[in-house]
Amino acid sequence: MLTRGSRRWRVPREEIAGLIGGLRERGVRHGAGRDMLGHRIAHVVLTRMEAAGEAPDDRTHDAVRRTREVRAVVDAVWPAVNPVRLVLRLLSDPELLAQAAEGLLDDDEQQEIRWDSPPRGPGSARWSAADAVLVDEARDLIERIPSLAHVVVDEAQDLSPMECRAVGRRCATGSATVLGDLAQATTPAAVADWPQMLAHLGKPDAGLRLLDTGYRVPRQILDYASRLLPLIAPGVPAARSFRQDAGSLAVVSATPGSLPAALVQACTDALDRPGSAAVIAADAQLTALAKMLGRAGVAHGTLDGDGPGARLTLVPVSLAKGLEFDHVIVAEPARIAAAHSRGLHQLYVALTRAVSRLTVLYTQPLPGPLR
């Protein structure tokens, strides 16, 4: 019931239900549908006004749409939805999650994503990167995310299917340039191949170009690292390098007792040459290696700024991607490979950080292809 002036205008419940059904059949997004419902109710009222001999115009339409009565109906039957709060509720409410996930996720999968201790609100929630793309997906279902003309994605091999969808929404009516190396895919949910990624991006027919020639890493180093490809990226051909240097690769065996001396020697040899140097190792081993170097008086720094001015940097393998150094010592490849579900991918990243010289230092047996 809407009161305007001395007249009252009534829109029956059944008619409003019909308006809602029509919008749902069109498949409009939630936010757009909410706005359209207000307009359609106003249109029904204006039709009744015209039938009663009145002459409403666009200003009347807007005024009716904004009335307290119309807004109350829209709020009741098509409430506003906040994407952050929607995902928060979904991950906190087992019954709601089960209802939404019926036929899509089994009980174990629902348990994996459900929060055991629901937060009080969005501000106290411990959001993850995976949760962020759920919020982005929800946001697009509510209000269409506008497309850009062109999107460039680097390190695309690390994108999950949901992250691909988030990128795809931003180039839905535009174009994209996607760059990556499947051998360096170190995230647990990374897509398996490029056709799968392009499908999730919404660009299944996009052109695929293989970049198989390198200039940064010497051939001897690249050939050694490429031995891992059959295990980490089956079907990906080994890249070729134009640079050759017979002395660019050294594989050094040590015993647990001789590891400190061997590490110090490898670092000293690297520091005797011009350029930057780094030790890359499994994250959990870095502290022990730092103590070995400290006891020997070898100055070193870290990525977070400790040891400013030192030419030698200790790098956890989880942060090595995208970095490059003139000289690299990869310590204990077997520990790198065993420390993560994609440890061999991380090892491949570590082995390809050197642009001049690579030393592989090990006490534990090397992963099979590197022996």
What are these regions (language model features)?
Residues 2-150, 159-165:
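Conserved helicase NTPase catalytic core signature
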